[in-house]
Each structure stands twice: as structure tokens, then as C-alpha cells.
């Protein structure tokens, strides 16, 4: 599936979560990397819900084919007490923003589950002028009950985000971890100081 619940594996998020790759009915299709990378007709939702197998790290780099310099953290701007699950967020991006898929690469719900969004090799749609060389991570929340900006992350969300960021830094050791606010001061997102908290 496209979800991972923090606590199932400890203490690290398993690399196989990031290395998941869809299975094809014809194994020979794996040999054609260009065909695999250029296929946009099938939505990521259906790809991510197929059976998956682990991919070696070196194969992952062949799949990504882009330089990652930033890991950008976002919030969904959802008030406390309300839900915005992965599929709802994805539908909103497709129907109301005109995207072909959810704009983020990872989405973390309040229960700590990490949902895979866009494939890492695909450019996201989450931070203007910085999408080409970045990975976007969004957590559900970011607003208090009265709709003011606030760090509403649950302990499970914090644990999942930390584990995910550590694994991504293993893959991209030179990438800077920043918040959306650090690149666009007009926005309070992600409603906490990501640079200070994830200085590793």
C-alpha cells in the first residue's frame, strides 16, 4: 500500500518505503527505463496501490534523475478537530488546482501514517520557483481551532517526520531541510521553525 504507520518498524523508517517500485505484468518492461519514467497516463494513486517490491538504492537514483537540494516541509492548513486525509487532499489538488496529482511527495496524517504522493523522480507542485530541485513533505494540521497558525503536530507525526527526514538525508546528504516560510516569508507554513528543529 501507499501508507506506513510509525511504530511498525523502529527506530528508523525502512528504506524499502522510499524504494518501493510498482510491479509490471511483463517483467521485461523494467528494462526500459525511459518508458517507465515517462508514463504519465496512469495516476499515482493506482500505481501506489499495486503490489510493490524493494528497489536497490542505486536503482532509485537512476529513477529519480534530478538533483535534490531542498527538502521543504509544509502544513495542510487544517484546523484542529478537522480531518484532511490523503485522498481528500489529493482530490483537492486535482479538482481545484488543476494538478495531475497531489503536489507533495509525502503526506503525514495526524495518526502518524506517511502517505506517498508524487514519485520522487517527478517534480512536485508545492513551492513556487523551488519545485524542480526539491522534495515536498506536508503534515496534516497547522492551524489551531480558531484558525490561527500553530504547530499542531501530534507526537506520532513528529516521530514519522523525523524518521522520514533522516532517511531522505541519507539519500540526499547535501539537501537542506527548510520550511515553506523560509522560502516565502508571506506564508506561515509549516507553522514551526523547521531549520532549527531539523539541524542535522
Segments (PLM) and residue ranges:
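Leucine-biased recognition of intrinsically disordered, low-complexity hydrophobic segments
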Residues: 13-15, 23, 30, 37, ...
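Short, conserved "active-site rim" segments that organize catalytic pockets and cofactor/ligand binding
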Residues: 63-122
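Basic/polar, cationic surfaces and motifs that engage anionic cell-wall
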Residues: 63-76, 80, 110-114, 130-135, ...
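Short amphipathic alpha-helices and their capping/turn segments at secondary-structure boundaries
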Residues: 122-128
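Intrinsic-disorder-associated, low-complexity terminal segments enriched in Asp/Asn/His/Tyr and depleted
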Residues: 19-20, 26, 32, 36-40, ...
Amino acid at each position: 500500500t501507499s501508507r506506513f504507520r510509525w511504530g511498525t518498524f523502529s527506530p528508523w523508517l525502512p528504506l524499502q518505503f522510499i524504494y518501493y517500485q510498482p510491479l509490471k505484468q511483463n517483467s521485461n518492461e523494467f528494462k526500459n527505463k525511459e518508458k517507465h519514467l515517462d508514463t504519465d497516463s496512469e495516476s499515482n494513486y493506482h500505481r501506489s496501490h499495486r503490489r510493490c517490491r524493494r528497489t536497490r538504492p542505486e536503482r532509485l537514483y537512476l529513477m529519480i534523475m534530478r538533483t535534490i537540494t531542498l527538502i521543504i516541509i509544509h502544513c495542510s492548513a487544517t484546523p484542529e478537530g478537522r480531518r484532511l486525509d490523503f485522498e481528500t487532499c489529493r482530490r483537492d489538488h486535482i479538482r481545484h488546482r488543476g494538478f495531475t496529482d497531489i503536489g507533495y511527495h509525502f503526506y503525514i496524517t495526524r495518526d502518524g501514517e506517511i502517505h506517498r504522493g508524487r514519485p520522487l523522480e517527478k517534480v512536485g507542485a508545492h513551492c513556487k520557483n523551488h519545485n524542480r530541485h526539491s522534495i515536498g513533505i506536508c503534515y496534516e494540521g497547522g492551524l489551531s481551532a480558531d484558525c490561527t497558525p500553530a504547530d499542531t503536530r501530534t507526537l506520532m507525526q513528529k516521530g514519522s517526520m523525523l524518521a522520514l527526514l533522516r532517511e531522505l538525508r541519507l539519500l540526499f546528504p547535501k539537501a537542506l531541510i527548510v520550511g515553506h516560510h523560509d522560502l516565502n516569508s508571506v506564508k506561515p507554513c509549516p507553522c514551526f521553525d523547521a531549520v532549527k528543529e531539523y539541524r542535522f
